Each structure stands twice: as structure tokens, then as C-alpha cells.
């Protein structure tokens, strides 16, 4: 009962805050292109992103909160512990009003997300919910997937083109290294699109929210480094047959030993086949 009362108190305090656009205008807080910032003010959309993550984990980590639109939504939807990682010092000062309203449920860390071990923040289970800077979004995802066991889920916004690559299936035009490495470690699905005009300033592309849920264990047995290596070889020239791409390792004989047709092309193979190649590659490279 006490927890519900505290949630209601925080929700009311956040609802009583001035409109976000008004606060941003008064503070003359402008998005910085150098930081990949695009502010999202629409509470309907930020709430939709927050609800896509429910039920919330013990620790909700937000990367790059900006003026706090999504942060507000997380608190309004009942998140009990939000840790926001932000490198823009202007924003940290601007968000003091939200820290006060959150009544202990919100903590800010001034740090570069690329250098921050977010998998060590708060208490497990953790989840990351973020409108990511597009210029580092893929790098961050791959870094976090190396620590997938430390997370319950990721609800992340990407350029639509990147979202399609993350969620693509064998045979899809977008299927490639990012699809394989992500889905080897997690399930991934596109949840909904957000149009450019929802942001300030509007980007030139449509954005897509993706839900990524780490698997209890990887889809098939192999080392991550070996999987990265064989997918780099296979997709280096994606139109080539695998026997040509792996000529250095024995060509057709190498591919057949993994139980794969040497005439196959990489975009048609399931993840398990790449894992079989990775295991063979590991034996050769030892």
C-alpha cells in the first residue's frame, strides 16, 4: 500500500509540473546536433514508449534524457527507480525540477553512455529505455548485448533503417551482421514508428521503437568473437556464394563440414548456420 501511495504522489507531482515545451522555451534549451539530440515532447508518444517496456524492471536506465520528456512518462507510468545517464551538463541543471518531483525515484549520472558500465547500475533486473542518439545507437546496442545477462529488456529507438536490420529474418533484404549478432543473443521486434515531425528539430528519417529481450542463453553454441568474424567474412561481399567468401579456409569443403550448401548466399542462412561456421572457424584459428 505504501508503494502505491508513493507512486500516486510522484505521478501527481509530475503531472503538476509546467508543460515541458514551456520550460524548454523559458530556459532556451536547444538540441545540440553534435550530441545527436532530437527532443521528443509529445506525452502521448513518450507514454507509448514507456508502456512498451512494462512491466518495469527494478532498475530502469534511460540514456540521454534530454529535457526529460520520456523521463516524465516513465515516472507517470509507475517506474520505481529510474537512472538517467546524460553527458550534456546543461540538461542536468535543467532537470532539477523533475528530480524534486520524483521524490527519490530518479537519479542522474553525468557520463558518456559509451564509457559508462550501465550493466552495473542499480539492482537487477535492469532494463534500458531510450531515445538513442542515432550516431552511436548501434555501437551502444552491441556493447550492451555483450552483457545481455544483466538486462531484462531494451526498449530503444533507432532510425527505421537500422531497426529493420536489427529485426530482419533470413531472406530479407535487410538481413545481415546486425540481425544475426542481435538475434543470436536476444529476440527483437519493431513496436511502432515515430514520424520526423514528432521531434524538435525533426530528423530527416522515420524512427522506430524496437523491443529487444535477451534470451536465457544464446540461440546456438559459439563464441561471440567467432560469430562476429564469420559474419564479417560472409557479408563482406554479400552477393558472393559462401564457398568463395571462405576460400581462404577451404572453400566448399569448409562450408560442407558445417552442414551448409556451399552455393548458399549469406543473406539466406539462419543464425544457427552461422554459429556452425563460427565453431569451425574457432578450430582453425586456434
What are these regions (language model features)?
Residues 1-233, 276-282, 286:
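Catalytic cores of RNA-modifying enzymes
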Residues 214, 231-286:
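C-terminal lobe and adjacent flexible extensions of AdoMet/dcAdoMet transferase-like proteins
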Amino acid at each position: 500500500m505504501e508503494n502505491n501511495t508513493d507512486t500516486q504522489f510522484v505521478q501527481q507531482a509530475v503531472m503538476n509540473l509546467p508543460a515541458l515545451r514551456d520550460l524548454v522555451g523559458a530556459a532556451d534549451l536547444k538540441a545540440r546536433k553534435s550530441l545527436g539530440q532530437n527532443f521528443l515532447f509529445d506525452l502521448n508518444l513518450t507514454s507509448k514508449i514507456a508502456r512498451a517496456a512494462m512491466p518495469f524492471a527494478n532498475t530502469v536506465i534511460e540514456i540521454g534524457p534530454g529535457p526529460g520528456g520520456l523521463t516524465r512518462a516513465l515516472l507517470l507510468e509507475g517506474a520505481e527507480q529510474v537512472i538517467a545517464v546524460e553527458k550534456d551538463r546543461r540538461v542536468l541543471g535543467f532537470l532539477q525540477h523533475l528530480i524534486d518531483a520524483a521524490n527519490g525515484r530518479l537519479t542522474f549520472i553525468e557520463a558518456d553512455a559509451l564509457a559508462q558500465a550501465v550493466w552495473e547500475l542499480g539492482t537487477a533486473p535492469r532494463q534500458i529505455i531510450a531515445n538513442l542518439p542515432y550516431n552511436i545507437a548501434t555501437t551502444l546496442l552491441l556493447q550492451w548485448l555483450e552483457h545481455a545477462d544483466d538486462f531484462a529488456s531494451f526498449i530503444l529507438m533507432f532510425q527505421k533503417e537500422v531497426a529493420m536490420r536489427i529485426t530482419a529474418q533470413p531472406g530479407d533484404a535487410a538481413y545481415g551482421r546486425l540481425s544475426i549478432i542481435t538475434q543470436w543473443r536476444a529476440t527483437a521486434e519493431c513496436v511502432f514508428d515515430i514520424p520526423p515531425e514528432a521531434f524538435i528539430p525533426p530528423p530527416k528519417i522515420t524512427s522506430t521503437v524496437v523491443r529487444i529481450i535477451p534470451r536465457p542463453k544464446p540461440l546456438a553454441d559459439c563464441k561471440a568473437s567467432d560469430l562476429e568474424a564469420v559474419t564479417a567474412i560472409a557479408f563482406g561481399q554479400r552477393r558472393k556464394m559462401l564457398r568463395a567468401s571462405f576460400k581462404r579456409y577451404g572453400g566448399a569443403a569448409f562450408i560442407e563440414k558445417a552442414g551448409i550448401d556451399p552455393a548458399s548466399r549469406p543473406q539466406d542462412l539462419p543464425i544457427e548456420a552461422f554459429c556452425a561456421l563460427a565453431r569451425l572457424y574457432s578450430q582453425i584459428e586456434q
